[in-house]
């Protein structure tokens, strides 16, 4: 457990933050530049903890070490990413850093290995000393807590691990974060804590303080119109692991073929993966689409390989990504995060945004970052494009999301 305050010049009793983004291609310089920029913004205040999001073109462990050396802070968590961002914009092949000086807080870092083969044990490792931290916070009258979780996004057990985290922390624990991603052509995602980085793992930062962190989510995806040949609601009639074999008793991929035809798209090997990713599945709860799932590939029998399991009998539809709607949704998520600060001033913002949204928006993704920035002007921000978004807070019980913008506001 670490106290939020640290020795150094001019301690203040409110949270302050600084961010940095480096587009330098050389790993031995990118982390240094991003950390130097973030440290400069703190104006001499010592960071309590921080976040490092790096393209897999950079060595994540090396980036963590560079940030630690420059900032003097080793309480860092990080992830590889499909794109990096700060309040200055969006980049690929970059390193993004957020350093937070939080004197009125206590926090704890944890690392959990073997996510694929032992997700329950991974979650237990991430929360092993959570109750001890909670007891310390209670003794100081600090009731609010948030867990930032980063997981290997190429593991198919992320959602199950998160459900175990819910059991290992406390009822209605607020949990945010994202699943580490990769650039096209790379196949190993990593998460990191302090000076180590590993695939097939998870990391956590648990923070307790006197003020609630604000969280907001939205996706802006739209269901098909009644005029289209794809049903507004389809039933998952056969599921094998995380593969949807059948929708309404037919090979699941047939629904996407009909959807593509409605949009004058001819699906082939060269575009099917992108079409699946940018037109994800919406999952209904009663008559409301409550979650989104991405199918990343198709099996030889027409099954859809998803990022997480769905229960047989689930009702789903195929959603469409209109760029304007995506950008507006990010703005709404930011507004919700600001509202959920309950009147507190924001010190920093984290943005966990899906890689599929980056793919759908392309060069326009800067506009999504700007939509968040418009709600939080002059507030340091960092984030990354994920392979799955994590947000469980008041009003939202399901922690795992796809194709969604998650905005997290850290209060002063």
Model-predicted regions and their roles:
Residues 2-49, 53-70, 74-75, 79-348, ...:
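Small-residue-enriched flexible segments
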């Amino acid at each position: 457990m670490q106290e939020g305050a640290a020795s150094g010049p001019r301690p203040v009793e409110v949270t302050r933050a600084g961010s940095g983004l480096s587009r330098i291609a050389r790993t031995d310089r990118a982390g240094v530049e991003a950390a130097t920029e973030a440290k400069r913004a703190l104006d001499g205040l010592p960071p309590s903890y921080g976040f490092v999001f790096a393209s897999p073109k950079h060595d994540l462990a090396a980036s963590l070490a560079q940030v630690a050396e420059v900032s003097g802070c080793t309480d860092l968590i990080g992830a590889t990413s499909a794109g990096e961002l700060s309040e200055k914009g969006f980049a690929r092949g970059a390193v993004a850093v957020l350093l937070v000086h939080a004197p009125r807080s206590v926090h704890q870092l944890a690392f959990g290995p073997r996510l694929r083969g032992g997700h329950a044990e991974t979650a237990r490792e991430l929360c092993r000393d959570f109750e001890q931290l909670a007891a310390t916070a209670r003794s100081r009258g600090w009731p609010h807590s948030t867990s930032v979780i980063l997981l290997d996004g190429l593991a198919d057990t992320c959602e199950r691990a998160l459900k175990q985290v819910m059991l290992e922390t406390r009822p209605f624990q607020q949990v945010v974060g994202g699943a580490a991603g990769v650039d096209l052509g790379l196949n190993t995602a990593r998460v990191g804590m302090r000076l180590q980085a590993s695939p097939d793992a998870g990391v956590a930062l648990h923070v307790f303080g006197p003020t609630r962190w604000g969280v907001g989510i939205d996706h802006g995806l739209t269901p098909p119109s009644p005029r289209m040949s794809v049903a507004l609601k389809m039933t998952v009639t056969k599921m094998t692991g995380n593969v949807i074999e059948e929708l309404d008793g037919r090979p699941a991929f047939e629904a996407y073929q009909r959807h593509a035809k409605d949009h004058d798209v001819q699906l082939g090997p060269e575009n099917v993966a992108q079409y699946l990713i940018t037109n994800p599945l919406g999952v209904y709860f009663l008559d409301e689409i409550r979650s989104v799932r991405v199918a990343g590939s198709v099996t030889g029998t027409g099954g859809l390989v998803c990022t997480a399991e769905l229960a047989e009998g689930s009702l789903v539809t195929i959603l469409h990504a209109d760029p304007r709607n995506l950008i507006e949704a990010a703005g709404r998520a930011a507004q919700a995060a600001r509202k959920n600060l309950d009147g507190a001033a924001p010190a920093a913002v984290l943005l966990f945004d899906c890689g599929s949204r980056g793919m759908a928006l392309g060069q326009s993704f800067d506009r999504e970052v700007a939509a968040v920035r418009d709600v939080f002007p002059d507030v340091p921000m960092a984030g990354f494009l994920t392979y799955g978004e994590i947000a469980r807070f008041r009003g939202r019980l399901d922690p795992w999301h796809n194709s969604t913008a998650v905005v997290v506001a850290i209060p002063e």
